[in-house]
């Protein structure tokens, strides 16, 4: 990779933080702000003691971050994993959430210690070509996530209206709801955080209700959760496992969390305050992901119980003999396994457990789609500002992301079938998994650099764990790329996929190389990359 070889000179302004040389002229900040400029004060407490008041003050960024673990992409991944593998992949969900927590801990620590988010650090350390490719891939991840939110919301509106709102109509409605969130943002950060906590509570109630009425077999569920095995599994189950990892650990969410923690007033000149902030953010993130894990577990268990090895004919018979018999026609009368999606999932729940289950499912799906809208906007804003130093108003950023997401979703909704919309959602989950190294590798790199993180750099044990994460993510994606090539519909696609694969592997190799340098591999140090080992020039 080539690009800028001389890193910009930086100066240390406070404990563990760095700042760029100021640009000439006043900063250009559009009206309406582009950043979480409101700072939440942290109450005083006796040093060395745990304070619930302090935990409450630090509570917010972790729950906003956890929304990415509950977006429609996750719900789709959960229900399909349950339908394809029953309870066999519950352990993948558990350990993917644990790995997600480790990554989010590193993201929060980077933001607290340096006072900068991951995008800003990437801008300072990576040469122009790699950081531009990184930025483009993160924008792709954000647009892909927003497309999933559009798809989930459109299907939710269709279910709630008993089909009166067509899918394309639901897609267009998502344009309107964005203005509501921009309006809500004017009421302050704490109220915004409270609203998203309310949406998480709705999801916990709705999907928890489905879990109670479905009554999954608890013994089989616990075995699937704590015994890592998958007897009789093939490529469909493997692809679902990859989809779970990609849906749970969202690449842009790591960039988002490193920025959200900057909304709390932390005195970065005092190591005690930094250590305390790291502790409280870790506790909050653990609680938030604990909640998100159980919500995902509810969905996967419900569909593992209701859909596993279910045939289309069986689903047709169930609906034909229920009060929702008009929906039976969506299931072909054959003995193939049901290809479950958002829509069919809601219908079969309604046929099995009554119309209330259908509408409660749709409300939960709607909450999942709506809650992810604003966090995706923030992520896009932080990524753009960090990588490009380009500041847009939140309205402009939201309009750009939603426009890019709506157009392909609208075309599929108008000209294709519902199944095509759900297939697009599956593809987007795999895309998130493929893009994951472009968030995981940078965060592992920078949190391992003593020159940047000082005494808060990852220790030997953490480096072993995080390096294992890096190898696992890269191995999963390499296996997927190799497995995917034979399934291409036409040989003409091979050239395009091969070109993209070369770029993908080239960027991944570069990121692994710089990560190894940051971990102390001095033999790999090139003169233009010494700052990954020794830090930026003072």
Swiss-Prot record:
Question: Catalytic activity annotated for this protein?
Answer: Zn(2+)(in) + H(+)(out) = Zn(2+)(out) + H(+)(in); Fe(2+)(in) + H(+)(out) = Fe(2+)(out) + H(+)(in); Mn(2+)(in) + H(+)(out) = Mn(2+)(out) + H(+)(in)
Q: Which GO terms describe its molecular function?
A: cadmium ion transmembrane transporter activity; iron ion transmembrane transporter activity; manganese ion transmembrane transporter activity; metal cation:proton antiporter activity
> InterPro entries under this entry?
NRAMP_fam
- Pfam families linked to this entry: Nramp (PF01566)
Sugar attachment sites: 321, 335
Gene Ontology cellular-component annotations: endosome membrane; late endosome membrane; lysosomal membrane; phagocytic vesicle membrane; plasma membrane
Could you tell me the membrane topology recorded for this protein? Multi-pass membrane protein
Functionally, this protein is described as follows: Macrophage-specific antiporter that fluxes metal ions in either direction against a proton gradient. Localized to late endosomal lysosomal membranes, delivers bivalent cations from the cytosol into these acidic compartments where they may directly affect antimicrobial activity. Involved in iron metabolism and host natural resistance to infection with intracellular parasites.
Q: PANTHER family attached here?
A: NATURAL RESISTANCE-ASSOCIATED MACROPHAGE PROTEIN 1, SOLUTE CARRIER PROTEIN FAMILY 11 MEMBER
Membership in a protein family: Belongs to the NRAMP family.
Q: What protein is this chain from?
A: Natural resistance-associated macrophage protein 1
Q: Which organism is it from?
A: Sus scrofa (Pig)
